[in-house]
Amino acid sequence: MLSSQTSSIFTVSRLNQTVRLLLEQEMGQVWISGEISNFTQPASGHWYFTLKDDTAQVRCAMFRNSNRRVTFRPQHGQQVLVRANITLYEPRGDYQIIVESMQPAGEGLLQQKYEQLKAKLQAEGLFDQQYKHPLPSPAYCVGVITSKTGAALHDILHVLKRRDPSLPVIIYPAAVQGEDAPGQIVRAITLANARKECDVLIVGRGGGSLEDLWSFNDERVARAIFASTIPVVSAVGHETDVTIADFVADLRAPTPSAAAEVVSRNQQELLRQMQTACQRLEMAMDYYLANRQRRFSQLYHRLQQQHPQLRLARQQTTLERLRQRMHLALENQLKQANQRQQRASQRLRQQNPQPRIHRAQSRIQQLEYRLAENFRARLSEQRERFGNTVTHLEAVSPLATLARGYSVSTATDGNVLKKVKQLKVGDMMTTRLKDGWVTSEVTAIKPVKKIRLG
């Protein structure tokens, strides 16, 4: 029974390999949605995390060459959509998925696109305060770009009628939700700028979800608002809703009604302000006239008390006194300047630089002579040391030994021959003499018997 089943017995390694091949070949690439947990990024740059839902979880790996294409930083608890290959890690038998691409799931993807476009336009300078147009004060004609059936238009018209019934309003209807909405909003802004009928534009709609307000996060709408020569007030959703259009517009209003408040004048308030201003002007004129009358009386009284001839005499005395003081001051300054000049001339005569120059020249000549003497002494010393070194090297040179009749023999492998047992009959050897080399063949070997002393 056991021998009949031997062909079906798997080793652990073979089993894991077979399962891995089945998973990779049968499943291929799949799309998986889930929540990220246990996210880590070691020094290798790879991502390791768990993808889970309410009832299950699976280990995931995303290698560096794949995760570098991801445009956001995965966070714990974030819902994502991944494209991955299913495999099995053979050494441990762990089932896992290898992620090739990742993107936020659902509204998270819209938020990611929102942040990317916001960063792009901000880098281009579309949000800079220097490009904002001031709103006209007062506005003589208001343009409204919104849906003609929406509640936002009703709120805007209601506020404008209450605050300034005489203010002209031109409506440029446009869809504010759906695929066609961005194009219609752009065309309405372009049309308003071409007609030049109004001096301020309100662009907006009522509240809604991120998807509902997405038309105002469209890049085309943002660039159209930025290019508008007519000041634009954005009024999208509620106060907590912030769109790309709000950053590009010249002014952001929290609601459509607030936008209408910003661009209009309150006629009742203007009338009250005019009445108050008239009263303040009358009081100011009365005070000014009374003050001028009092000042005139004071000046007239002083003029009667101070005769012009008396004032001229006092001024003449003061002028003469000032003239004398100025004359004395000039004389003192000239005297002091002359004294300073004399002292400077005396110091200059005492500090003649010529003797110092002569002393410096003598010092230089002495130093040059000492330098030359030191150089000659050092040169003689070095020559003597060099001669001694040459004599010493010649005394210990092996060539001198060879000159006295000695020789050095080497085998064919280059080793120096010191004993006869390094050779055998028929070997070749090379002998170094004083004036050259001799190559010879060994024909006989005769060892020398050692002489024992004692």
Swiss-Prot record:
The cross-references to InterPro entries, in alphabetical order and at most eight, read: Exonuc_VII_L, Exonuc_VII_lsu_C, OB-fold_nuc-bd_dom
Under the heading Pfam families, the entry gives: Exonuc_VII_L, tRNA_anti_2
Which region is the signal sequence? none
Q: Which UniProt keywords apply?
A: Cytoplasm, Exonuclease, Hydrolase, Nuclease
Where does the record say this protein resides? Cytoplasm
Q: Does the keyword Nucleotidyltransferase apply?
A: no
Q: Where is this region: Disordered?
A: 337-359
Provide the GO biological process annotations: DNA catabolic process
UniProt feature, compositional bias: Low complexity = 337-352
Q: What do we know about how this protein assembles, alone or with others?
A: Heterooligomer composed of large and small subunits.
Q: Which family does it belong to?
A: Belongs to the XseA family.
Q: What does this protein do?
A: Bidirectionally degrades single-stranded DNA into large acid-insoluble oligonucleotides, which are then degraded further into small acid-soluble oligonucleotides.
| Protein name, as recorded | Exodeoxyribonuclease 7 large subunit
Q: What is the scientific name of the source organism?
A: Salmonella arizonae (strain ATCC BAA-731 / CDC346-86 / RSK2980)
